[in-house]
């Protein structure tokens, strides 16, 4: 008979074993980076520490060889099934999943993402947001991630990455809050005069989903809002009568 504490310790060990298997896959594929390996290493160490704390608990029942043997055999059967299932998924779909905790909701991880949904979690006061790679359709990239706030003070966001990127497009700017297909790059002109206020000057880049080309359309509106005040009268006084006659004489030669 497996006690409640033994069951919790077993779950912690299985969680650590799962992260160890994911770490092994990353090492075999040569995808070694601090972003991908550090969360897995921390989870493995935390899982073993948690399991040891359960085993050292004063409420833990005394050691019996039969119960220990049953627990070990149960863990062996369950872990074997999980390893086989995960191995099939990884081989068939090339999945790589791991967690990453950060102080920001969407840290710059080198890829662009598009949010496609969110839902309320019963055990949490914060909603879970779901993202997919921006190039999921264009380049058949099946990488996704979900982000959820797990702590308030200080704020900590947990990002769970699922799938493996096959796209070759890396993010240039940290714009993962809203990975949209239309980007507006603001161009602020130098002010000509304090009384001139530019209406708009934008370069709009539209990325077509159905085409492989990018159409650049530049909208440059050189219209200005002019304040009606005595400033213009002082800056541009009216022509005197002599200058007017001079201009009329010049126009007579044309």
From Swiss-Prot:
<keyword id="KW-0805">Transcription regulation</keyword>
<dbReference type="Pfam" id="PF03106">
    <property type="entry name" value="WRKY"/>
</dbReference>
<protein>
    <recommendedName>
        <fullName>Probable WRKY transcription factor 67</fullName>
    </recommendedName>
</protein>
<keyword id="KW-0804">Transcription</keyword>
<dbReference type="InterPro" id="IPR036576">
    <property type="entry name" value="WRKY_dom_sf"/>
</dbReference>
<feature type="DNA-binding region" description="WRKY">
    <location>
        <begin position="102"/>
        <end position="170"/>
    </location>
</feature>
<keyword id="KW-0539">Nucleus</keyword>
<dbReference type="InterPro" id="IPR003657">
    <property type="entry name" value="WRKY_dom"/>
</dbReference>
<dbReference type="GO" id="GO:0005634">
    <property type="term" value="C:nucleus"/>
</dbReference>
<dbReference type="GO" id="GO:0043565">
    <property type="term" value="F:sequence-specific DNA binding"/>
</dbReference>
<dbReference type="InterPro" id="IPR044810">
    <property type="entry name" value="WRKY_plant"/>
</dbReference>
<comment type="function">
    <text>Transcription factor. Interacts specifically with the W box (5'-(T)TGAC[CT]-3'), a frequently occurring elicitor-responsive cis-acting element.</text>
</comment>
<dbReference type="GO" id="GO:0003700">
    <property type="term" value="F:DNA-binding transcription factor activity"/>
</dbReference>
<keyword id="KW-0238">DNA-binding</keyword>
<comment type="similarity">
    <text>Belongs to the WRKY group III family.</text>
</comment>
């Amino acid at each position: 008979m497996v006690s409640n504490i033994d069951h919790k310790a077993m779950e912690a060990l299985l969680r650590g074993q799962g992260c160890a298997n994911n770490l092994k896959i990353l090492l075999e594929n040569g995808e070694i980076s601090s972003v991908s390996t550090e969360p897995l290493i921390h989870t493995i160490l935390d899982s073993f520490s948690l399991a040891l704390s359960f085993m050292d608990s004063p409420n833990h029942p005394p050691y019996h060889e039969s119960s220990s043997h049953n627990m070990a055999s149960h863990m062996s059967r369950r872990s074997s099934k999980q390893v086989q299932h995960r191995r099939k998924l990884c081989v068939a779909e090339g999945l790589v999943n791991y967690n990453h905790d950060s102080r920001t909701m969407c840290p710059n991880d080198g890829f662009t993402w598009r949010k496609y949904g969110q839902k309320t979690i019963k055990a949490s006061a914060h909603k879970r947001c779901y993202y997919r790679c921006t190039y999921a359709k264009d380049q058949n990239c099946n990488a996704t991630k979900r982000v959820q706030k797990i702590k308030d003070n200080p704020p900590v966001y947990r990002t769970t990455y699922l799938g493996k990127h096959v796209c070759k497009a890396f993010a240039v700017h940290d714009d993962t809050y809203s990975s949209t297909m239309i980007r507006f790059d603001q161009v602020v002109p130098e002010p000509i005069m304090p009384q001139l206020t530019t209406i708009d000057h934008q370069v709009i880049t539209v990325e077509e989903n159905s085409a492989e080309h990018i159409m650049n359309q530049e909208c440059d509106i050189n219209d200005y809002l002019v304040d009606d005040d005595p400033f213009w009268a002082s800056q541009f006084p009216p022509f005197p009568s002599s200058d007017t006659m001079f201009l009329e004489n010049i126009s007579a030669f044309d």
